[in-house]
Swiss-Prot record:
<feature type="active site">
    <location>
        <position position="48"/>
    </location>
</feature>
<protein>
    <recommendedName>
        <fullName>3-hydroxyacyl-[acyl-carrier-protein] dehydratase FabZ</fullName>
        <ecNumber>4.2.1.59</ecNumber>
    </recommendedName>
</protein>
<dbReference type="Pfam" id="PF07977">
    <property type="entry name" value="FabA"/>
</dbReference>
<keyword id="KW-0441">Lipid A biosynthesis</keyword>
<dbReference type="GO" id="GO:0005737">
    <property type="term" value="C:cytoplasm"/>
</dbReference>
<comment type="similarity">
    <text>Belongs to the thioester dehydratase family. FabZ subfamily.</text>
</comment>
<keyword id="KW-0963">Cytoplasm</keyword>
<dbReference type="InterPro" id="IPR029069">
    <property type="entry name" value="HotDog_dom_sf"/>
</dbReference>
<dbReference type="InterPro" id="IPR010084">
    <property type="entry name" value="FabZ"/>
</dbReference>
<dbReference type="InterPro" id="IPR013114">
    <property type="entry name" value="FabA_FabZ"/>
</dbReference>
<dbReference type="GO" id="GO:0009245">
    <property type="term" value="P:lipid A biosynthetic process"/>
</dbReference>
<dbReference type="GO" id="GO:0006633">
    <property type="term" value="P:fatty acid biosynthetic process"/>
</dbReference>
<comment type="function">
    <text>Involved in unsaturated fatty acids biosynthesis. Catalyzes the dehydration of short chain beta-hydroxyacyl-ACPs and long chain saturated and unsaturated beta-hydroxyacyl-ACPs.</text>
</comment>
<dbReference type="GO" id="GO:0016020">
    <property type="term" value="C:membrane"/>
</dbReference>
<keyword id="KW-0456">Lyase</keyword>
<keyword id="KW-0443">Lipid metabolism</keyword>
<keyword id="KW-0444">Lipid biosynthesis</keyword>
Amino acid sequence: MYTIEQIKEVIPHRYPFLLIDRIIEVEEKKRAVGLKNVTANEEFFNGHFPDYNVMPGVLIVEALAQVGAFAMLKDESNRGKLAFFAGIDNCRFKRQVVPGDQLRLEVEIMKIRGPIGKGHAVATVDGEVACEAELTFALK
């Protein structure tokens, strides 16, 4: 298990854009599982939406990408590199994510060719799929 401080040693994201709280499983360059505890104090709820708080889907996808980045950047050969979005395919949102939910963020790296890779990403709440997508990334 990796704490927030250990996560910050691997990926460059910081408040207010660090969207994962813990990594609970990792196989370097293969897969990782992270957690995001969604609270009513999230800054984005001030505008999305003030009277009906829903976590923006793009931030769920970003949280998934950060978990995937952790899986890639945890490997010693990738230390100090950055992981950039190169594409998002077949993204579907199937459940709203609201304050009090705990997002389980799972990313499996499916293919790596040079600095480009693709991963299958799934975010769940209480075992129910909230978001699923294919994420393409580039390491630099």
